[in-house]
Amino acid sequence: MANYFNTLNLREQLDQLGRCRFMDREEFVSEADYLKGKKVVIVGCGAQGLNQGLNMRDSGLDVSYALRQAAIDEQRQSFKNAKDNGFEVGSYETLIPQADLVVNLTPDKQHTNVVETVMPLMKEGAALGYSHGFNVVEEGMQIRKDLTVVMVAPKCPGTEVREEYKRGFGVPTLIAVHPENDPKGEGWDIAKAWAAATGGHRAGCLESSFVAEVKSDLMGEQTILCGMLQAGSIVCYEKMIAEGIDPGYAGKLLQYGWETITEALKFGGITHMMDRLSNPAKIKAFELSEELKDLMRPLYNKHMDDIISGHFSSTMMADWANDDKNLLGWRAETGETAFENYPETDVEISEQEYFDNGILMVAMVRAGVELAFEAMTASGIIDESAYYESLHELPLIANTIARKRLYEMNVVISDTAEYGNYLFANVATPLLREKFMPSVGTDVIGKGLGETSNQVDNATLIAVNETIRNHPVEYIGEELRGYMTDMKRIAVGG
């Protein structure tokens, strides 16, 4: 199979990359009605599979789960997830032929095998759904021409999809129809109904494309969302320990600090996050973030280039074929890092202390968000997509670190995201360790500036504020956050 994106001409590539429109709520007045009375069969019952299925059932859809016969016979976790929640469970051969919509929610590396297995069983004119387009875009899966192919991609982990639905809301969601597979012209009706059934329409849906979703998703998760948090955690912890800061305090400052800092980011963007600092600390964080942007821009651009060209995907798929040797090795190495093994502590850290003593963390967040956004938009991805795949998802990923450090982050994200995270962090960590960290001290990570006055030069502060507030990610962020009027607050501080 050929990489689908690479079969397109330049005009088609740019058109697909630039697809992203925030949809009016009026476009969802019929909610999930288009799929009511039809049979939805989900393949896979992990976090996304189970939680999307629960939401769809609660929205009035007929949902069942098709699993491999071995998973049923051995009563694996996927079988238990579905059965314990009262769903019908059957083999592919039993359930797939009845399905009007087959939703493939298995891990990326299983997609080719799953689709090749279920496609011959699907009835003529049925629909096939994805929540990530890697199989279509990067692997170039050829799907029967009578089948409609759609995507509904919630912009958060599966557990959050369920929790937001239960509180009467939802999570922002990208939806798309594969242009090669919409024979009856009903793709958008199916995608909108599926998105509404998960609750996504209440938080806002973006009309996107398979290409835009995949390329922006890969870039965000490799760099700012996962790779930067991993590299930052490792080098900041090392620095604090080397400077004599208590290991328990250093670890807790990082583990819960990312979550606390990005909580401010979620509600008011980079501007509000930086405003949580004192004037001297804000100027210092700004200066550090500018240095970081200069240092790390080539690395961010390389990841974007490798994603656009397909080099990243081919490299990762080669590791799939080698039994995930690199992935598993990098996972083990991460588990051995000092940050992952810092001693538990009962030390109290106030919310503001995370900002005051984590100035470098704030700088890393600003630099990482802006670099990822800039790399994406320079490659033809439009601002809305770039925002959701950088700034918007960052608090959700930071929350996983707060739960169980880097281990939890790498468990919750997909194998594709985990592989890309390691590729980035394995270069970013020594880069920061050698070229940046020697020049910083505990005044910006661990102890704070200890200033007795908030006084700064007015002209300098005005210039810093203008630069922060006039970045394009702040403009689109303010617009998109306006659509999300009921965002859930998360606990901060551990």
From Swiss-Prot:
Residue stretches making up the KARI C-terminal knotted domain: 209-344, 345-487
Residues given in the record as Mg(2+) 2 binding sites: D217, E389, E393
Binding locations of NADP(+): C45, G46, A47, Q48, R68, R76, S78, D108, K109, Q110, G158
One Gene Ontology CC term in the entry: cytosol
Pfam families named among the record's database cross-references: KARI_C (PF01450), KARI_N (PF07991)
Record note on cofactor: Binds 2 magnesium ions per subunit.
Gene Ontology molecular function terms on file: ketol-acid reductoisomerase activity; magnesium ion binding
Cofactors demanded by this protein: Mg(2+)
TM regions (residue ranges): none
Family per similarity comment: Belongs to the ketol-acid reductoisomerase family.
Protein name: Ketol-acid reductoisomerase (NADP(+))
Organism the protein comes from: Vibrio parahaemolyticus serotype O3:K6 (strain RIMD 2210633)
